[in-house]
């Protein structure tokens, strides 16, 4: 369970941390360097993801990308839509599909920052507007890895002679960063993650511009108000802010590893960051030899892998108050002994005592069909603003067949996921605004289903969650949740 101790103080009593000389002192130093940044990341994201003063150059780039995307859509689709009179027959569906097509093409033209937003949209099933999720999955956006020559220059500027060499080819990469094998000056093999050049500046500018665009769309297109696109802009900004400073990667890895150690999770290995080698643009960690999850997931034992993945997300969140909040194939590896390994933890979910109790109470309410209890849980988490008709919200939840416990649980994981999606739609319709950490937690549950499907088509999320479900009464008693 989380405590008032700092991460360094908790690491000081950890067997996992003791293996790396100097790690505890390094953690204390990293905490001092970015304490204010880490504690205010949600507020910073909220400020950026609001309409405000726009950066001139990036705004011009965004405007050009939007005009090109709109022109491409008009040339390819508008004549057919006019001929079929879709805007008259299906105005809401036509508006959503058209906006999704244009925005997806605009993200392509915005480069790596746009690709990262698309990736976050893809991961946010049930939370991001569904028409956007469908579009980026139908037409995925990818970016190539940064050249090895550039990576070596970044590492040399960051760490000088401390890192002797870095492999040209990345083990894995995302629009934000990439991971390479490397060798320290003393011959020790490590893994080095570097931030993509310029991504931090583009991300800051794009957040403000996208917020202005999302606000305008909410006002001009009624069909887009219910999904609350501004809320998604805030979610994406929060995640990208944390990912952009790789000192967070070092601290997140330590926090996750301490939770794994305390919970006794044996099916996953978390590498230790190397003391003295963590800066905003680069970080070095222990070398974890393995194969990318994307190509080797089918070789895992489904049950053991499911326990490990649930352990670092749902179980860690409810028991320890921290969880891996960006669990995607690029952040996982498969070891030769059949275990998983963490190759990246750029985003860590951190519950306050109130959000932790709220999440626990909500899950218990879902399983028992206590809809009033579910709304009380959301109030406890700070998700229900003033002016919400609570009684009507409870009635709407209770009147939805797909949210009844028997309907959600008897149909397997697909029924459960469909129920969560229905619940999100109802909550947004009532203008609920859950804290970002709760949104990240819900998103992690959807990510689990996707990862388990890669391991085995027969893997079932509900079965994997049962050990945690069985612990809910004890956790409720521990946290005084009624």
Predicted segments with their positions:
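Short, amphipathic alpha-helical segments that act as regulatory/interfacial helices
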Residues: 111-115, 211-214, 254-257, 424, ...
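Residue-level signature of catalytic and energy-coupling elements of molecular machines
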Residues: 118, 179, 192, 249, ...
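Hydrophobic residue at the +6 position relative to the catalytic HRD Asp in the kinase catalytic loop
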Residues: 330-334
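Helix-rich C-lobe and terminal helical cap/extension of kinase-like folds
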Residues: 10, 15-38, 42-53, 93, ...
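Glycine-rich ATP phosphate-binding loop
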Residues: 188-195
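N-terminal accessory/targeting segments that precede structured cores
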Residues: 1-178, 201-227, 459-460, 464-467, ...
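Conserved ATP phosphate-binding architecture of protein kinases
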Residues: 178-184
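ATP-dependent phospho-/nucleotidyl transfer catalytic cores
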Residues: 130, 137-144, 156, 204-205, ...
